[in-house]
Amino acid sequence: MNAHKERLESNLLELLQEALASLNDSELNSLSVTRVECSKGKHHAFVFVLSQDHKILSKLKKAEGLIRQFVLQASGWFKCPKLSFVLDNSLEKQLRLDAIFNEIAKGKDND
């Protein structure tokens, strides 16, 4: 990945956290953005949020305009990528893998 894209994604992640914190919705205020992945042309960004509630995605979709407006004002950028919000299940996957490794380790201890 090139340095420019990494910097853009990092800046966008910080701005999105600030944008969510500035909204008047307590559910959206408490969300954590775990990572941002921009497309090659940087016209589109996938925003991964940490939540178990699928309903939060519809709230984020409704607030996308306000979030993009905040990002534009705070960054001074000419354009803001279109945002697609995705539930981040990487933590859940990591917990499952840890449980599997623990079972394997217990099996070796019993041998």
UniProtKB/Swiss-Prot annotation:
Main location: cytoplasm
Keywords associated with the record: Cytoplasm, Ribosome biogenesis
GO biological process, one term: maturation of SSU-rRNA
InterPro entries per record: KH_dom-like_a/b, RbfA, RbfA_dom_sf, Ribosome-bd_factorA_CS
Signal peptide: none
Pfam families (UniProt xref): RBFA
GO CC terms in record: cytoplasm
Protein's UniProt keywords contain Membrane: no
Family: Belongs to the RbfA family.
HAMAP family for the chain: RbfA
Subunit-level organization: Monomer. Binds 30S ribosomal subunits, but not 50S ribosomal subunits or 70S ribosomes.
Full protein name: Ribosome-binding factor A
Encoding gene, per UniProt annotation: rbfA
